[in-house]
Structure formats: structure tokens, C-alpha cells
Amino acid sequence: KLSLTTPVKKIFEAINSHSSESEIRYVGGCLRKILNNEKVDDIDLATNLNPSEVTEILKKNNINFYESGIEHGTITAIIDDYKYEITSLREDIFTDGRHAKVKFSKDWKKDAARRDFTINSIYADLDGNLFDPYNGKKDIEIGQVSFIGNPEKRIKEDYLRILRYLRFFLNYSKQPHKEEIIKVIKINISGISIISKERLLDELKKLLKSNKLENLSKDKFSIDLILLIFPELKNIKSIIDAIKVKRELFVDLDFMFTLFLMIIDETDNLEYFLYKYNISKKDQKRAYAISNFYNEKNGSKTLNEVNLNKVLYYNGKQAVLDILNFKIIKSKKLDKKMLSLSELYKNKITPSLPVGADLLMTRYQIPEGRQLGSVLKLIEEEWV
């Protein structure tokens, strides 16, 4: 039985009452998580109506929405600040290894057939009655990740499914990799090269968010495959140390920091990764703040309050905590000095330069321009 909220009931009632043939069902991740006793964060819905019919119904029932992926038949409804993606049933009419061209359908079985894995092709109505044409519920129960139909055909439709397979295997599998799937992935791994860097990084982020990341250390096939796709993650086993520290210190290690653990070393690995994946300026600055400490010959000696205060001023509190967490994890032990510094900086406020341009101009009559900037910079350097 599904636990329903009033907002989603409103959407069900609006579409189901449209006509005797209109239907809407839960689909995909929310059902997979419910059946696996996980917390549900997003609710996806599928309907046998086309997008224009869905938008008319939402308007009629005063439900706010926006066209989030209209070319793929997706409308996002918004009720009480919650978002619900409503996607029309589809059939693939063309795939090229990256994208699919679709047509809208009325056939639930055909919509299920175009999905990647059996555990993602489960639907349920308002009362929780399942439509499960590929026995996804059973695969969840026995811990098996199975492609729908021919694995090679499904991978060739979208090569990102290789990385998606690793993510779902990590989260749901209680079985070893099937030899057939290993063989098919090895044959088709080169297809990953046509997938955009943005999609690859987004899928990696989902994989690294797994609460079963520790299992990766026991899965040589998955580690080897990740390194084939992301060769810069050469220190991938660092994430196991990170998980242990996270558990003991109750620290939140976000995606970017987890990435930095795997790519920062004494080589130009970091620079190459940041360039290759077009990482934002903000995250680049964060990475270099860590790297500048890590690459010092006597890194532990530089981790004192004087130098950390400089980082605090120029880069902010997060940069200081990143440096300390990085050092703790890389040392593979809970260093008392590092822990003490970490506690100290958690409560520190980023300082501000007590002298400004206005003071220099009014009290010392320094004219606005290059001279003022130079004097201000000298004062700042001395103060820091």
C-alpha cells in the first residue's frame, strides 16, 4: 500500500476524472525505493494522455506547472512547493547511442519496454496496485539488476546505461555480475566516448551519493570500469577511507570533495580533470585551495593557524574545513591536531579587512586610482 500525500492525490484525481480512458500511475524510482524500503525523495508519474492534454487538465484544475522536457513528453506540476514530473507514455522510434527520438503512446507495455532495467519499469495506480510487466518487484526482492530484453541492444540505445548499470548494481544487487553483462559491457565500453561530459559527471555524482559506496571496494569489475571511463579517479579507494571518517566524525562529504579525494595528487591530474569536465570557477578555486596544501613537501607543517587563517580570509571557512578533512582522510587516522583545528574553525567567522578605501581617502588624502589600490593591497597583505 502506498503512502499518499494530498498534493499528488489532486493530480491523480484531475487526470483520472478527465475521461473514462485517461490514466495516471506512479512509475520508476519512487516505486523502486518504496519496494526496497528506502526514503522517497522524488515522485515521477506516467500518463496515457499526451502533453497538451496534460497541460489543459492542469490549467483547468488550477495546478501550476512548467514544460520541463516537452520534447520528451514531460510536464512538471507544482503543488505546495513540491514538484511532480508527469510524462506521457512513449515509444522509441530512433536511438543513436546518446538520445532517443520518441512518439507518444497509449500502450503501458510499450512504455515499459523502452526503459533500461526491470526494477525501473514498475507502475502503480492510486490504490497501490502494481503493473509490473517485467517482474521488477521480484528482482528487487532477490537483489538482481536485469536489463529489459537484450542487454547489448539496450546499451547501444544509450551508452550511459553502462554507468547507470554500475549505480543500480551497487545499490540493489545481492548477486555477482552476470557473465553475459560483463561481456556485453566490455565489448561496448568504447561507446561511452560519444556521451557528453555533463551527462557522465551527473551520473557519476548519483553513483557517489550511494549509501552503499563501501561495497565498491569488493567489486573489482566496477572499479576497473569506472577507471576506464574516468581514468583521472586514480585514487578511487580513498572514498572508502572517507566513508569511515564520515561515519566517525559525522561530517558531510559532498560530491565535489569526494571527487577531489580521488583526483588530487602530486601530478597534473587535477588540472586535467578540471579542464576536461569544465568544472565551475567556484569549484576550481575550492580544489586548488586543497591542492596547494597537499602538494607542499612538508604539508603537515603548513597546517597551523597562521596559514589556515590566510585560507579563511581569502577562500572562506569551507576551504579550511576541506583542507583539514582532506588531511584527516589521507592520513587514514583521526589525528588529534587535525581534529582540534577542525573544531576550532567550524566556529570561526571569516574576518574582514578593518581598513577600507574610504578611510584612506578621507584621513590620508590618498586619491582614488592606482595608488589607492596599491596601498590598500600592501595593507591587506601585511594585515593577513
Predicted regions and their residues:
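Catalytic cores of the polymerase beta-like nucleotidyltransferase superfamily
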Residues: K1-V384
